[in-house]
A protein has these predicted regions:
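Short alpha-helix capping/helix-loop boundary micro-motifs
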Residues: 37-48, 281-292, 414-420
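Extended, domain-scale alpha-helical bundle/helix-rich regions
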Residues: 85, 114-131, 138, 146-350
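Polar/acidic, low-complexity leader/linker segments enriched in S/T/G and N/D
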Residues: 1-19, 209-211, 365-371
């Protein structure tokens, strides 16, 4: 049975006694990878291939006699072949925890709507770290958008853990090879403390728990933290949280750390400020001690007893340890002072919560390009704030759909309360994405650009003089467009409305066309003028109506023609006047009717001619008077007929024919001359049957049966 201190090392795939440990150095601290450096000797294996050792699990055991005092497990990350004297081979080896693998992978990726446990779990699982435990008591809300950008998985994990106030350490089972990574946000979950007495005797055995040296120190550290941030959803929110440090009796309290942006969007920022404060002051008070016990390592709590300075006899939290073992006799023929073990450790008062100091977040060097995404078949995909989602060129994980990124705000040319400019980037368009404060978690779209598949309007360079704003019909091929062409001598402003165009002017509108103005309307036009309309035409106006024209004037209409007016109606013209109608001609008026003219007067018609009045009828004239007809001639009245002139009244007739005959026929004929009745003829026949019948008036062959009423037309 062995009674002394000894160290052994086993490597998977090799015999348990393949190596003898000459010395080792185990360095551990909270939120860091432990590093175990070993010097080894082997008499069995004078030559080893790297594939037999590297990436294999190795197990260091510290013994006191046959009792295990400590076990450490890790993977071999470095192996060196040393001297070979043909009897034995010296080797050097470095062992690290499985978490060490995370430092070998660098990545660009996006985590969406995941909390810190889910994010870190993904990183650990992908790196083969299966034995780990999250011990969280603080709230850790999900993050809408969290980006790992060019960081190793290890750097990203450490940064995220520090930001969330989480520290980690390796929990070693003392009597077995069980070992796991513990992520913790409170000291309450640390193992129960155990007592270690003060004993300055450095010759105690390893199995004897004691501390031989213990030095307590304090230093000036930041005294307070102020964090501030902004969210567009609550622009008036102060977004500020203050956290004062504790236990600052020995220093001034003016050492403020101001952090912006604080990377929070709500009341959770108070926790961020507190976690930062704990991190900045994690080494404000530190005690450093020495012991031969291997049981003191980060993640454990101890209670110091028996120290001559009474205030040091209290509970402490171990934050770092440096365990060094020497076993020189493992090399045959080499003498030494025997097997030794020293543990230099650091502790802080157990009533303080140790947290890692905040780590710098990578900043983006400049804008990036991305492609707007959305659901399959959708052309425009946005939320109530006009935000869109994009697919970054470096993103290998998220598909190009409605989940490819967080909602990203879009910078517009102008943005006011209910006014400004708005143009939503469409699915498939390439956009330029910048980042607020260089923070990958806060993207913002600052512009758009064309590429080989999304070409510009027009055909460059031929249309290089054109400035164009052209939209595209939603799920269609049409477009609306405003185009300015600055080609010399061909300057043009072009407006195209795919369907409806509405223009609203609340006060005045002036249109000034220096040369020509042409309007073409495919269907109907309606113009409504509430008050007055004035048209001034300098020279000529031509108005052509293809079918019908209706003009309605509510009250009066005045038409003034300075010189001539010609009105031509192809078939029929009807004029209806409600009360009175007057035509005044200053000089000459001529009416020409090619076929028929009809005039109807409901009551009376008067005709006044200042001097002469002439009526010329080519064939026939018919007058029909319902009652009385009266003609009055101031001087002379002449009635002339070329063949037959007849005057009739009932049975009385007076007929004059062209041969000079005069026929007077009536029932009773009375001749009365107040002075004389004279008659002269060679022969006068009275009552002798000499009278001849009165001839009838000839009937014209071209007389129509009756004049039509033109109103029917």
């Amino acid at each position: 049975m062995s009674t002394g201190l000894r160290f052994t090392l086993e490597v998977d795939g090799l015999p348990p006694d393949a190596f003898a440990v000459v010395s080792f150095h185990l360095n551990q601290s909270l939120s860091s990878l432990f590093s175990l450096d070993l010097s080894l000797v082997s008499q069995q294996f004078l030559s080893l291939e790297f594939q037999q050792i590297l990436d294999k699990m190795a197990y260091l055991t510290i013994w006191q006699g046959d009792d295990v005092q400590r076990r450490v497990k890790g993977m071999v990350t470095w192996f060196e072949l040393g001297e070979n004297d043909k009897n034995q081979m010296l080797y050097s080896m470095k062992v690290c925890p499985p978490l060490w693998r995370t430092g070998l992978r660098q990545n660009f990726r996006i985590f969406q709507n995941e909390d810190i446990e889910s994010i870190l779990g993904t990183i650990l699982q992908e790196n083969g770290v299966t034995e780990w435990s999250p011990l969280f008591s603080e709230p850790h809300p999900s993050r809408e958008f969290c980006v790992q950008y060019g960081e190793t998985d290890y750097d990203f994990l450490c940064r995220m853990a520090a930001e969330e106030g989480i520290f980690f350490y390796e929990e070693h089972a003392q009597k077995s090879t069980d070992q796991s990574l513990v992520l913790c946000d409170t000291v309450r979950y640390l193992p129960e403390s155990f007592e270690i007495p003060w004993n300055p005797n450095t010759r105690t055995e390893v199995s004897t728990l004691c501390i031989s040296q213990f030095r307590y120190s304090a230093q000036i550290r930041p005294s307070s933290v102020v964090t501030k941030d902004y969210t567009f959803k609550r622009p008036g929110w102060a977004g500020r949280f203050d956290q004062e440090g504790q236990y600052q009796d020995y220093q001034r309290t003016q050492y403020e750390v101001y952090d912006y942006p604080g990377r929070f969007k709500g009341a959770h920022g108070q926790n961020f400020a507190r976690w930062q404060m704990d991190g900045w002051r994690n080494n404000a008070e530190v005690a450093r001690g020495t012991s031969r016990s291997p049981e003191i390592w980060p993640g454990r709590r101890i209670v110091l007893t028996g120290h001559p300075q009474a205030n040091l006899n209290r509970e402490w939290q171990v934050v770092a340890s440096d365990l060094h073992g020497e076993q020189p006799q493992a090399v045959p023929g080499r003498r030494g002072s025997g097997t030794t073990l020293d543990n230099h450790f650091a502790v802080i008062p157990a009533d303080r919560t140790w947290r890692p100091q905040p780590l710098l977040k990578p900043l983006v060097d400049g804008p990036q390009s991305a492609v707007v995404t959305g659901p399959a078949g959708e052309e425009i995909f946005c939320d109530e704030h006009g935000r869109v989602r994009v697919k970054f060129n470096w993103d290998r994980y998220n598909p190009s759909n409605q989940e490819s990124s967080c909602w990203i705000r879009v910078a517009q040319a102008w943005a006011g309360t209910g006014f400004g400019n708005l143009a939503i980037p469409r699915v498939g368009q390439e956009v330029i994405v910048d980042f607020l404060n260089g923070d990958l978690d806060q993207p913002i779209i600052m512009g758009r650009t064309y590429h080989q598949e999304n070409r510009t309007p027009g055909s460059l360079p031929g249309t290089k003089t054109q400035m164009t704003i052209r939209s595209k019909t939603y799920k269609g091929s049409g477009f609306n467009e405003l185009k300015f062409d600055d080609a010399t001598g061909k300057e043009q402003v072009y407006i195209h409305a795919q369907k409806t165009m509405n223009t609203e002017v609340l006060n005045n509108r002036t249109t000034d066309v220096i040369n020509n103005h042409a309007e073409k309307i495919g269907n109907n036009q309606a113009i409504t003028v509430t008050n007055n309309q004035i048209q001034n035409i300098g020279v000529n106006q031509i108005q052509t109506v293809g079918v019908n024209q209706v003009e309605t004037v509510g009250s009066n209409q005045i038409i003034k023609v300075g010189s001539n007016q010609v009105e031509k109606v192809g078939i029929i013209r009807a004029l209806t006047v409600g009360v009175a109608y007057q035509t005044t001609v200053g000089g000459i008026m001529n009416t020409s009717v090619a076929l028929l003219q009809s005039s109807q007067v409901g009551l009376h018609k008067s005709l006044m001619v200042g001097m002469g009045y002439s009526v010329n009828v080519g064939n026939n004239v018919t007058f029909s008077v319902g009652k009385t007809m009266k003609e009055n001639t101031g001087q002379t009245a002449v009635y002339s007929a070329g063949e037959h002139l007849e005057l009739c009244c009932g049975k009385a007739r007076l007929v004059l024919t062209k041969d000079g005959s005069i026929f007077l026929n009536g029932t009773h004929i009375h001749l009365e001359g107040e002075s004389d009745v004279n008659g002269d003829a060679p022969v006068i026949n009275w009552n002798c049957g000499a009278t001849q019948p009165v001839p009838d008036a000839p009937v014209p062959k071209d007389l129509p049966p009756g004049m039509p009423d033109m109103r029917q037309f």
